[in-house]
């Protein structure tokens, strides 16, 4: 729970700094429209970080059921090209495959759902996993961030995080909160 006063301060700080494009509202979920809007956001607003939340609702050109993974691969390639051409960073949310993930193990890059090229083409891949309620007290953290792939440096890691609902922020377990932009 975030107190209203703090939520209002955070929302006020974000105003004018965050460009949100919801393709469900705009009715433009095809791959060409998404890339066009991203290019517009770079030119018009100077956006340099992009988030695509899930490929499942995207509409791909020339897609049939049997070509769905090929279409995902092609679109992921287009996102990589866009990022490199514009010197920006694109985060693509890909949910884990159903099945074996119920066993108590950390996710790996192989658990990422969709086309294998999603992981192959990415420069970085990471997972964010919430702890089960019954385990939080025992372990002392709420979530784990695992760096699954790091093309720049090659190193991977598992980081324990604690969520502070009061300020909507994850911090590394054991590190104190800092002063955030909305607090100034």
For the regions a language model picked out, list residue spans one by one.
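Intrinsically disordered, low-complexity boundary segments flanking structured domains
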Residues: 2-12, 113-114, 133-134, 146-150
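Intrinsic disorder/low-complexity segments enriched in polar/charged and small flexible residues
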Residues: 15-16, 172, 184
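Cytosolic-facing regulatory segments adjacent to core modules
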Residues: 1-45, 158-160
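P-loop NTPase motor core
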Residues: 23-145, 179-183
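Alpha-helix initiation/capping motif
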Residues: 2-3, 97, 108, 135, ...
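P-loop/Walker A phosphate-binding loop and immediately adjacent motor/lid segment at beta-alpha junctions
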Residues: 133-181
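Homeobox/homeodomain signature
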Residues: 8-11, 102, 108, 151, ...
